[in-house]
Amino acid sequence: MSFYEELKWRNLIKDSSDEKELKNLLDCKKIKFYCGFDPTSDSLTVGHLVQLTMMSLLEKQGHSPFILVGGATGLIGDPKETEERKLLSLETSLQNAKSLETQLKKILFQKKITFLNNYEWFSQLDIITFLRKYGKLFNINYMLNKQTVAKRLSSGISFTEFTYMILQSLDFHHLYKNYGVQLQLGGSDQWGNITSGLELIRKLETTSHAFGLSTPLLLNANGTKFGKSEQDVLWLDPQKTSPYKIYQYFLNLADEEVVNCLKQLTLIPKEEILELEKATLQTPQKRLAQKALANNIVNLIYSQKVLQECHKTNEVLFLNKKKESFQEADFTLLNKTLFSYETSLVSIPLSEALVKTQLTTSKREAREFIQRGSIQIFNEKIKNPDYLIDKKNTLFNKYVLLKKGKKNNSLIILN
């Protein structure tokens, strides 16, 4: 199996330009490629892992990765399908860009990667040059037919977001001309922008050897965007989403989803993935594929030490069936791995505690879960929506373990 064929086997290729020549380049030569990340937030999500896997595989094959952080394009905003993005301030965009670069370096620390920020060149580009030199090369009808723009025409799209495609195209041309980058990677929702960049390079350069490649969007079995928990996005920043929550998410993945995730989100060799697929069919109760997936991803994003803490947390939560079996040292660990809320109050309403620890998004939702019998304090089911947590509920005079369903846990600390 060639390298390109392996990428297809891993379901990492959705679209590609000039596939025959691109296959030859990736299989037989060494090229420079890039992937862009806009700083619309200060953290990536688990949905970005497919891009990081693709970059790691290409780098392992000997190709040279560039990561472009969009300090400038983040100020404009890629058109969303349903509504206009809220504009970020320059300060926020640049700070987010710095945070993303730090996060990416930590995750990909063993890779030789060149980091660039497009604010460096766009901040030097004046509006007249932009319109005369580049604006004349983009046909409005061509842009209107692009999927991201077409979906917004009925609801309306600002000129600001309409120009995003041009800016991303200029990025590709800038990297192609100044750094010799031949390939742009992106999610399938970026394919229109990628092909616009290829078209711009063709118009501006006498010879064009540029290529585009898109990866499938990661979707759950029900077709929804992968990486969403019940309440929110699963962030890679441990301050926004606990590593244990990420670990649990993948550990509890459905059998019909896990093999594809092993292909798209890990560097586990094909032979091992096929063995795990076989095990999932023959002994699904052992969840060997889910364990391998969760272990690999947590180790990639964080560290072996964090992975060990996740294992230990599972032991503490699921072996201690009775409240009195917990040790005080267990809560030192849980305070680190679970989402916890510490208060100086002597009591707190259960509905408020559920919101504070992100087990629910609102008090109304919290009350509904309580009334349905889905909430426990340690192993005591609570059905009173007006229940008040106080010292009677604590262990070691301050710790209260909250449970929603069988798999969601958080900690309240009454000091």
Swiss-Prot record:
Major enzyme class: ligase
Domain S4 RNA-binding residue range list: 348-414
SUPFAM superfamilies documented for this protein: Alpha-L RNA-binding motif (SSF55174), Nucleotidylyl transferase (SSF52374)
Keyword Acetylation included in the entry's annotation: no
Coiled-coil regions, chain positions: none
An annotated Gene Ontology molecular function: tyrosine-tRNA ligase activity
Any Pfam family matching the protein: tRNA-synt_1b
Keyword tags: Aminoacyl-tRNA synthetase, ATP-binding, Cytoplasm, Ligase, Nucleotide-binding, Protein biosynthesis, RNA-binding
GO biological process: tyrosyl-tRNA aminoacylation
Matching PROSITE patterns: AA_TRNA_LIGASE_I, S4
Motif 'KMSKS' region, chain ranges: 225-229
Binding positions for L-tyrosine per the UniProt entry: 34, 164, 168
EC number(s) stated in the UniProt entry for this protein: 6.1.1.1
Main location group: cytoplasm
Superkingdom in the source lineage: Bacteria
Chemical reaction(s) catalysed: tRNA(Tyr) + L-tyrosine + ATP = L-tyrosyl-tRNA(Tyr) + AMP + diphosphate + H(+)
Location in the cell: Cytoplasm
Residues spanning the membrane: none
Residue sites binding ATP per the record: 228
Sequence motif 'HIGH' region, location on chain: 39-48
Function: Catalyzes the attachment of tyrosine to tRNA(Tyr) in a two-step reaction: tyrosine is first activated by ATP to form Tyr-AMP and then transferred to the acceptor end of tRNA(Tyr).
Subunit description: Homodimer.
Family stated for the protein in its record: Belongs to the class-I aminoacyl-tRNA synthetase family. TyrS type 1 subfamily.
Protein name: Tyrosine--tRNA ligase
Gene: tyrS
